Each structure stands twice: as structure tokens, then as C-alpha cells.
Regions:
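A glycine-rich helix N-cap at a beta->alpha junction
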Residues: 55-82
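Short internal beta-strands
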Residues: 36-42, 76-83
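Short, glycine-rich nucleotide/cofactor-binding loops
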Residues: 6-20, 52-53, 57
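Histidine-anchored nucleotide/phosphate-binding helix
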Residues: 19-38
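Short acidic, glycine/proline-rich loop/turn micro-motifs
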Residues: 49-52, 91
Length: 119
């Protein structure tokens, strides 16, 4: 059986390639039916914000790719409640439905996976 993988995305979509790379890993892993989840933490929650204008800063819009995650079998999607609140985001206004977790639940989530990649 394949080891489970948690991808933690901590970078805003306009702050370099890390957000795109985390998404690419998730889509590739999902395409191969790997057991994986994706956690949006710190500035990574900005990837989930609706109505972004990435072209204004010459970046690619990740919203369509994020919305493709469930089609690739990546359904375990999580966001840190503290990160959302601190950045003025609400779970109801995100481009993708995610499970919002508090700090204790985040610790349990990370322990649940065999391998963790942070970008």
C-alpha cells in the first residue's frame, strides 16, 4: 500500500512558484491514486480566496486548477482556521470547500499522514 502524503502549502499564489508546485504535486499524486491531502496554512490560505486578479501581478490564476483537485481524487482539503481569520478570509467565500481546522486538529492531521511535504 502506498504511503499517505500531506502537502502543506504555506505561500501566497503571487509569492513565487511554491503554490503552483504544491498544486502540481497534489494533482500528479491524485492522478496516480496516491492517498494524499492538502493543507493550506499561513499565507497559503490566500490561494483559496475568491475573486483574485493574478494577472495584475503577472501570475497564473490557480483557481481552476484548485477546483480540479476533487476530480483528480484529492478530496482531503484543509485550511487552518487561525490563518484564515488572521488574513480576513471566511470559509464560506473560498473557491474550494475545505475542512477548517483549529490548532489541535492540525496537529492530529499532520500525525495521520506517513509523509509531509511543506512548500
Amino acid at each position: 500500500m502506498a504511503k499517505s502524503l500531506l502537502i502543506i502549502s504555506r505561500q501566497a499564489p503571487w509569492n513565487g512558484p511554491s503554490a503552483r508546485e504544491a498544486l502540481d504535486i497534489a494533482l500528479a499524486g491524485g492522478a496516480f491514486d496516491l492517498p494524499l491531502g492538502m493543507l493550506f496554512l499561513d499565507d497559503g490560505v490566500f490561494q483559496l480566496a475568491a475573486e483574485q486578479q493574478p494577472t495584475a501581478v503577472q501570475q497564473r490564476n490557480l483557481a481552476a486548477n484548485l477546483q480540479a483537485l476533487p476530480m483528480f481524487g484529492v478530496e482531503d482539503l484543509f485550511a487552518c482556521s487561525h490563518s484564515l481569520t488572521r488574513r480576513g478570509l471566511e470559509a464560506d467565500n473560498l473557491v474550494l470547500p475545505v475542512q477548517v481546522l483549529d490548532d489541535a486538529a492540525l496537529t492530529a492531521l499532520i500525525a495521520r499522514f506517513d509523509q509531509v511535504v511543506t512548500l
